[in-house]
Amino acid sequence: GENHHLAHNKHIIDGINKDVGPLYTHEEAKDYYLELAKDWEDPYGIPQIVEHEGVRVVRDDFITGSKVRGGDCLISSLPEHIDTIVYVQPRTGLAGVSILDVAKRHNKKVMLFMPSSKRISHHQACCIERGCDYEFHRIAAMPNLNLIAKKWADQRKNAFFVPLGLKHEKVTAGIVKTASRIPEPEEVYCATSTGVLTRGLQIAWPNAKFTSVCVARNMKDGELGRATPISEPLAFTSSEKKENLPPFPNIDTYDGKVWKYIPKNSDKDILFWNVGKEPELHDETIYDRIDSYRDWKKNAAN
């Protein structure tokens, strides 16, 4: 059974941003990523910022999700012969629909590996409706599924594997370039699972103070950068209480958990990065048509 009170409050807080090379200053890192993205223009435009209760909010709920930005920087740079993007889509997360959005723009297919369950999740159903190829695997933990997906991609010359959270330097470059077009705030709040977004924003805004609300798991070496972590006690799959949700569309298992921690109408310039909203599913019959249950493979090596 699932443990709904998973303790993820044993973060490694080392002040290190693993996306900044050990020999780089923050300024050099920023220059490095801006150079990486110099030929890329964000097709989704400068993020729309709306003030809510004295907080500047990046409203990426107006697009499929923030991951389309860095995702486009990566996918637009892939060689011609790559026609399939491979990714692991957990039950919760906008990466799948975001990759599909970008892949369509570049005429590429998407192969998603998903954890087996009795019934697919809303986010997985949206990916299937939007045309991904997919495989379900019974796994004990996400890293195992990452290995399966990477192996599948490695065996095919035309496939490109994207790690969980879209961890790739071109994705970071896209985040840095887009954020650099927004005036630097004093403080930044964002939801954090893998840390890709907060680390990219820290490079773009070297003087801002960062708070990461960790919603998914313990943060490992170099993942938090200089962000101060807040451990969200709710399990990743549990939704935030309605009364704590922000006054704009959000994912209630992700960004929805951050709003309650942000000081409202303070005298500080605080920015909150809202990565998206719930994707829309048009065909509800998908839930019953897709058989996502798999038994454990006998003697399968993990």
Locations of regions flagged by a protein language model:
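Acidic, low-complexity, intrinsically disordered interaction modules
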Residues: 3-20
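Positively charged, low-complexity intrinsically disordered leader regions
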Residues: 34-83
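Active-site-proximal loop->helix
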Residues: 73-74, 97-140, 203, 220-226
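A short, small-residue-rich loop immediately preceding and capping a beta-strand
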Residues: 82-102, 106-114, 187-194
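Short, well-ordered alpha-helical microsegments
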Residues: 93-97, 120, 195-199, 256-262, ...
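Small/polar-residue-rich loop-to-helix segments that shape phosphate-bearing ligand pockets
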Residues: 116-184, 226-250
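Internal active-site segments that recognize and position negatively charged phosphoryl groups
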Residues: 175-181, 188-199
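Active-site/ligand-binding loops adjacent to catalytic centers
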Residues: 207-266, 286-302
